From Swiss-Prot:
InterPro entries on file: EF-hand-dom_pair, EF_hand_assoc_1, EF_hand_assoc_2, EF_hand_dom, Miro, MIRO_dom, P-loop_NTPase, Small_GTPase
Effect noted on mutating E354K: Induces collapsed, globular or grape-like mitochondria
Protein's UniProt name: Mitochondrial Rho GTPase 1
Keywords: Calcium, GTP-binding, Hydrolase, Membrane, Metal-binding, Mitochondrion, Mitochondrion outer membrane, Nucleotide-binding, Repeat, Transmembrane, Transmembrane helix
Gene3D superfamilies: EF-hand, P-loop containing nucleotide triphosphate hydrolases
Record-listed E.C. numbers: 3.6.5.-
Length: 662
């Protein structure tokens, strides 16, 4: 509930006691003589007996049926209507005029129907709506009145009905609370009174909450899990007697209610089933205790439309233009725990059934994953099941490419804190200058790097990606149409671990390479050619000529298929010559059959991302003294000028002082 102010418009025939209700409610006493129509009255939160359920302010709007224009104006700005009648004539007018009039205005707001002037009622009797407060401050509401039932059946916009008396103060606070509750805890999204069932969206939300609360994945909520859910949602323990009452109630329903006679709602020694959890919340809705259900739903960030709050799924994160987003230690820890929780057979991999259970409380696999052939975009075991290493690598890639997807799925998985705590933003990329050229500075705070693998078709790019994931070489050639991704972790000297993303661009290669914004996501470009194909290297030369801005990025030349006979390239310049001309390393000769050469390449790519200056074209080696951060140079120069100016000013003052003393 995000509304801070609720507007309650009080309607009804002349003489039913609308103004008296307002005065008696606010003054706590009955005043016989008052004006016909009261001005709007604002009631603060602390007036309510249940401040947790109340908005910041509730405005009561008194109306008169003699001025329909003013009445309609107020109705159109109302959040809830308090419709009052007091006798047979005004009761008939409710269904013959008032409710049809609301419909004619196109209003889609709840109506609280109130029978006023019930002065003879001193307590709730069998003919009135029973309203009582139990030990948990929940409201149990039941309509048992011959007047109310027919009108409730005909007009679904009526939220509930109540009898009041302005003269004796009977149920005034309760009526006011029901007006608030119709907005703060609406019944309509949860329960379909016409069929007597929870609505589909409510069922979906409650099923997801059950799955997240079933910590041991046994399909039952045992006493400890119920206690945990109770503390999480209501910040207090559940009474043993109340818990036993719930169990007995569910057992009784499953034995005697024909609808549930063959369905287990509670199993002694195991706990409440998913069906039992749904039935319990259905009972809350039927008895007017849907505040309980809403408390559960809102703890899990559901809005009034029963979707998870978008601000929770996609929190705003300030990311500078040259920064990237990675998982924090807390994020990695949570994802490790999720993996271990759903690895039921403890074989170190998530099979299809385990993945299905894991993603059951989400909308399904992320779109990024389905478009990149998950799980074969990362490390899988010999059964094709994603390993923990592959799981963490996949989420590292997802966070780097689209952190908003990660925050959403963290919430879906049940991450309890602000999803931003599971992420960390790297420092903005600094630029340095050497030989008049700007290039990227060294990196020391990142663990995830992105590499575009480009080259002529059939030069071995796909085999390179497969080898990166530890898969054996295949002789079968399959051209890459859509972009492909491979992500894995690797360890450099010193034991520091990094995640490397290799992207093969497919038919989108030209479009991506000419998109300078897309290239900002790229840390290294791996220029691959087939050393056994004399026509292969010319493709790279033409790319570098066409997209000259590629030379602003670190480049790594790779000569693939080195196990085959090396061919002279039919090109105006040979690979080694071009590398020398660009001041980058000579091509690294690799083969999918030589594992050591592949490992050397992946380490080389990562090192190029960490130290861009050694691999960016057009940067001849210079002494460290000449290769400095251009911002630092400006700072040092400015400091020097300032120091000289200060010394000059001091000397002038000393000179003038000396001259004056003479």
């Amino acid at each position: 509930m995000t509304k801070e102010t609720i507007r309650v418009v009080i309607c009804g025939d002349e003489g039913v006691g609308k103004s008296s209700l307002i005065v008696s409610l606010t003054k706590a006493e009955f005043i016989p003589t008052i004006q016909d129509v009261l001005p709007p009255i604002s009631i603060p939160r602390d007036f309510s007996s249940s401040p947790t359920y109340s908005p910041k302010n509730t405005v009561l709007i008194d109306t008169s049926d003699s001025d329909l224009i003013a009445l309609d104006h107020e109705l159109k700005s109302a959040d809830v209507i308090w419709l009052v009648y007091c006798d047979h004539e005004s009761y008939d007018h409710v269904s013959l005029f008032w409710l049809p009039h609301f419909r004619s205005l196109g209003l889609n707001i709840p109506v609280i129907l109130c029978k006023n002037k019930c002065d003879s009622i001193s307590n709730v009797n069998a003919n009135a709506m029973v309203v009582s407060e139990n030990s948990d401050d929940d409201i149990d509401t039941k309509v048992e009145d011959e007047e109310f039932i027919p009108i409730l059946m005909e007009f679904k916009e009526i939220d509930t009905c109540i009898k009041t008396s302005a003269k004796t103060q009977f149920d005034l606070n309760q009526a006011f609370y029901l007006c608030q509750r119709a907005i703060t805890h609406p019944i309509s999204p949860l329960f379909d009174a016409m069929v007597g069932e929870l609505k589909p969206l409510a069922v979906m939300a409650l099923k997801r909450i059950f799955l997240l609360s079933d910590l041991n994945q046994d399909s039952y909520l045992d006493d400890n899990e119920i206690l945990g859910l109770q503390k999480k949602c209501f910040n207090k323990s559940i009474d043993v007697n109340e818990l036993n009452f719930i169990k007995d109630l569910l057992l009784d329903i499953s034995k005697h209610d024909q609808e549930y006679i063959n369905r287990k709602l509670y199993v002694p020694g195991k706990g409440i089933t998913k069906d039992g959890f749904l039935v319990l919340n259905k009972i809350y809705a039927e008895r007017g205790r849907h505040e309980t259900t809403w408390a559960i739903l809102r703890t899990f960030h559901y809005t009034d439309s029963l979707c998870i709050n978008d601000k929770i799924l996609h929190p705003r994160l300030v990311v500078p233009d040259t920064s990237s987003v990675e998982l924090s230690p807390k994020g990695y820890r949570f994802l490790v725990d999720i993996f271990l929780k759903f690895d039921i057979d403890n074989d170190g991999g998530l099979n299809n059934q385990e993945l299905h259970r894991l993603f059951k409380c989400t909308p399904g696999l992320p779109k990024l994953w389905t478009s990149t052939n998950f799980p074969f975009s990362t490390v899988v075991n010999n059964k094709g099941c994603i390993t923990l290493q592959g799981w963490l690598a996949q989420w590292s890639m997802t966070t780097f490419l689209n952190y908003s997807t990660t925050t959403a799925y963290l919430v879906y998985f049940g991450f309890q804190e602000d999803a931003r705590l599971a992420l960390q933003v790297t420092k903005p990329r600094k630029m340095r200058r050497r030989s008049g050229k700007l290039y990227r500075s060294n990196i020391n705070d990142r663990k995830v790097f992105n590499c575009f693998v480009i080259g002529k078709p059939c030069c071995g790019k796909s085999s390179l990606l497969e080898a990166f994931l530890g898969r054996s070489f295949s002789e079968e050639y399959s051209p890459t149409i859509k972009p492909r991704i491979a992500v894995n972790s690797l360890e450099l000297k010193g034991g520091k671990q990094y995640y490397l993303i290799l992207q093969e661009l497919g038919e989108q290669e030209y479009a991506i390479l000419e998109n300078k914004d897309k290239l900002k996501e790229c840390d290294v470009i791996c220029l691959t050619y087939d050393s056994s194909d004399p026509e292969s290297f010319s493709y790279l030369v033409s790319l570098l000529d066409k997209f000259t801005h590629l030379q602003d990025l670190p480049l790594v030349f790779v000569a693939s298929k080195a196990d085959l006979d090396k061919q002279q390239q039919r090109c105006q310049i040979q690979p080694d010559e071009l590398a020398d001309e660009l001041f980058v390393n000579h091509p690294l000769h690799i083969s999918s059959r030589w594992l050591s050469s592949l490992n050397e390449l992946f380490i080389k790519i990562t090192e190029a991302a960490l130290d861009p200056g050694k691999n960016t074209p057009g940067l001849p080696e210079e002494t460290a003294a000449k290769d400095v951060d251009y911002r630092q140079t400006a700072l040092i120069f400015g400091s020097t000028v300032g120091f000289v100016a200060l010394c000059s000013f001091t000397l002038m003052k000393l000179f003038k002082s000396s001259k004056f003393s003479k």
